[in-house]
UniProtKB/Swiss-Prot annotation:
This is tRNA dimethylallyltransferase. Monomer. It comes from Syntrophomonas wolfei subsp. wolfei (strain DSM 2245B / Goettingen). Pfam families: IPPT (PF01715). Belongs to the IPP transferase family. HAMAP family: IPP_trans (MF_00185). It is an enzyme of class 2 (transferase). The record marks 100, 123 as: Interaction with substrate tRNA. InterPro entries: Dimethylallyltransferase, IPT, P-loop_NTPase. Its cofactor is Mg(2+). GO terms for molecular function: ATP binding; tRNA dimethylallyltransferase activity.
Amino acid sequence: MYKLAAIVGPTAVGKTNISLEVARQINGEIISCDSMQLYRGMNIGTAKASKEEQNIVAHHLIDIADPHENFTVARYQSLVKDLISTINARGKIPILVGGTGLYYQSVVDDYTFFPMEVRQSIRDKWNAIIQEKGLPHVYRLLEQIDPAYAQIISPNDQKRVVRALEVYELTGKAFSTLQDRAENTYYLAVVGLYLERRELYARIERRVDEMIKKGLIEEVAALREKGIDLSYNSMQALGYKQVFYFLEGFINREELLNEIKRETRRYAKRQLTWFKKDQRIKWFNVGDFSDEELLVKNICTFMEGQFGIV
C-alpha cells in the first residue's frame, strides 16, 4: 500500500509554512488540496506558496488550469491518485496540503464518480426545481435527507446543495455517510491544524489586509479584462467574488474589506466543522507550541510513527 500524509485545517492557520518544513524533514512532496490554487493567475487571493517556496520542496497541482475551466473534483482525484503512486515510487511521501474538504475526502475515502451524462440529467432536474420553487425549498429537502451535510454548507450554496441531492439519487445514501474508507488503499497520516477562534480570526483580518496591499484588486481586474466573470467556478473563490462586486461599483472599499473578512471567517468555521468529523485526523493547536520548530517536530514524530519510519 502507498503512504499518504495530509495537513489540513482552516484558512490562515499556517498550513503552508508548516507543510514546507514537514515535507523537507520527512522527504515529502506537497500536493495542493485547494480547489482554487489550481487556477493560473489567481495567486494573491488563494495564498499560493511562492515560487521560492515551491523551489524548496516539490509542489503539485498548482497553476494547472485556466480560470475559465470548470475543474471538477473527479478530475482532481484522478490526478492525485497518479501523483500518489509516482511520488511513492520515487521513495518519497506525498503530502496533501489544504483546506478544501471535498477534495481531501475524495482522495482519502476513494469516492466513486458516476458518468457525467447521468449526473448531468439529475443535476438539471434539481436546478429546474430550484428555478421553479426556489433554493430554500430544495435546501429544506436536503435537510431532511442529509441533515449532517446541510449543517456544514451554506443554504445559498446551490452547487453543493444540488451535488448532495445528486449523490443521494445515485447511491441511495446521504453524502455525509459515504465513508468508504481508504485504509485498504493507503497508509494514512493526517494532521489537522487549528487555533483558538480569536487568534484565527485575527490572522484572517491581517491576511485580508495584506492581500489587498499586495494587489488582490488589481489581480481580479486583470482577470476581468480577460473576460473572466462570476459565471466561472474560479470566481467563486473567497475574495474574488467580492472584488468583482467592488469593481462593478456595487460596494465601496470599506464594504469590500468587511465582506471578505466576514465570508472568510464563515468559511473557516465550515472548514473546521467538515474536518472535525474525520476521526483519523490528529489535531494540533498551533497556539500550544512556543515556536514553529517544535510544532513541526511533533508533527513529524506523529507521521513517522504512523508510517513506521525509524
